[in-house]
Amino acid sequence: MRREVMALVAVLAGAVEAFPRAARAQATGVPSFNAPYRAFQRSELGAVFSFPEGGGTAFEGVYRYAHGKFDIGLRGGFFSPGNGANTVVLAGVEARQRVITHTMDFPLDGALMVGAGANLVSGGSALIIPAGLSLGRRIDPQGSTVSIVPYVQPTFAFIVGDFPSDLVFGFGVGADFRLSRVLDARISGGLGDRPLTGVSIGGVWVH
């Protein structure tokens, strides 16, 4: 099972590296995407590290909670571009709604993802409004306590700010790993349009 997990992580990282013009597509503009399932009954709390292609590191705290058929996520943190550039403040909100359940004819589950967020920095602030569809399916390997949700998330994002507005398309690729009843590990990356590409790695405590 460990070999299977490591192989999947390597494939995801390699796919992101193979496409040099990927987009940041989520609410705060980092390549952190979402599986079609929520991993929690009430809420989850965790952290995400993102590594854009151009350098620098983003760190975000994330909190997501159930609200009827929706779950709503709040995220905020900082992006440090390095090379003496100003640190960017990140803040955003996301919502997920399950809209597709797998059948004999269509083997994937799906959820609609929408959000809004901001990158705040002097002379380069941006408002990001993404909308996408996450498609995937949970895999429960026999004899293992670890389950995996590989998924894709095609996403459009409207970006407006201290520069000409733009509509970009990103193709998210990721996997969620249920390591225990209370712990999830996550990796994702974006393919598609610029401005940024990279990978995100996170962990959450689920309740």
Per-region residue spans from a language model:
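Hydrophobic helical h-region of N-terminal Sec-dependent signal peptides
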Residues: L8-G14
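Outer-membrane beta-barrel transmembrane domain signature
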Residues: T28-A35, P52-G55, T103-D105, M113-H207
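A generic structural signal for ordered secondary structure
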Residues: Q41-A47, A95, G172-D176
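Bacterial N-terminal signal peptides that target proteins for export
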Residues: M1-L8
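Mid-chain, structured segments of secreted extracytoplasmic proteins
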Residues: D71-F106
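C-terminal segment of classical bacterial N-terminal signal peptides
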Residues: G14-A22
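Short glycine/proline- and aromatic-enriched beta-strand/turn motifs that initiate or cap beta-hairpins
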Residues: R21-S80
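Short glycine/proline-enriched coil/turn segments at helix->beta-strand junctions
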Residues: A66-F70, A91, R181
